[in-house]
């Protein structure tokens, strides 16, 4: 960071219900938002014509607004479908970028749907077991331990 802090420097920005550190570079500061990675942040900054070498606190109100609008509706700004984190949604078949609280809600809804239709994945989630085909004979043991009775 520069030795002299600019006059209109914001140390903390509030974007999409998340506090963003103003001292970090904009591309990396945006990754504090849940559902936002470095690659997506980079694309959003380029589409918004924001210099990625700038610190998050140095951005003007106009630049912040542009970044937020592109983050919230990326398909209007020609960000490809394969770049988005919610592809072919089960309910409506749409492509979207889900972030912050909406991401948690979508994940919970997906798990509830899997449990409701009694899918194998849903049942494994319900039982608290490994879901993705891992072995469970020896690893992943937790909870109360069962001791072995000693011979007299």
Swiss-Prot record:
* One GO CC annotation: small ribosomal subunit
Can you tell which superkingdom this protein's organism belongs to? Eukaryota
Keywords assigned by UniProt? Cytoplasm, Ribonucleoprotein, Ribosomal protein, RNA-binding, rRNA-binding
Q: Which Pfam families match?
A: Ribosomal_S13 (PF00416)
Report the GO molecular function annotations: rRNA binding; structural constituent of ribosome
Compartments in which it is found:
Cytoplasm
Cite a single GO BP annotation.
translation
The entry assigns this protein to a family as follows: Belongs to the universal ribosomal protein uS13 family.
Say what the protein does.
Located at the top of the head of the 40S subunit, it contacts several helices of the 18S rRNA.
Q: NCBIfam families from the xrefs? A: PRK04053.1
Protein's name according to its UniProt entry: Small ribosomal subunit protein uS13
Q: Which organism is it from?
A: Argopecten irradians
Lineage from the top down? Answer: Eukaryota, Metazoa, Spiralia, Lophotrochozoa, Mollusca
């Amino acid at each position: 960071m520069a030795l002299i802090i600019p006059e209109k420097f914001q140390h903390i920005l509030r974007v999409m219900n998340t506090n963003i550190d103003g001292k970090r570079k904009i591309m990396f500061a945006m990754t504090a938002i849940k559902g936002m990675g470095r690659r997506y942040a980079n694309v959003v900054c380029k589409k918004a014509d924001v210099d990625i070498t700038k610190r998050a606190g140095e951005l003007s109100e106009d630049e912040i607004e542009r970044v937020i609008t592109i983050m919230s509706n990326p398909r209007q700004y020609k960000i490809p479908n394969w770049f988005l984190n919610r592809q072919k949604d089960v309910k409506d078949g749409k492509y979207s970028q889900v972030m912050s609280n909406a991401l948690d809600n979508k994940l919970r809804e997906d798990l509830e749907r899997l449990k409701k239709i009694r899918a194998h994945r849903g049942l494994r989630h319900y039982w608290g077991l490994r879901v993705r085909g891992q072995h469970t004979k020896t690893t992943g043991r937790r909870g109360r331990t069962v001791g072995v009775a000693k011979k007299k």
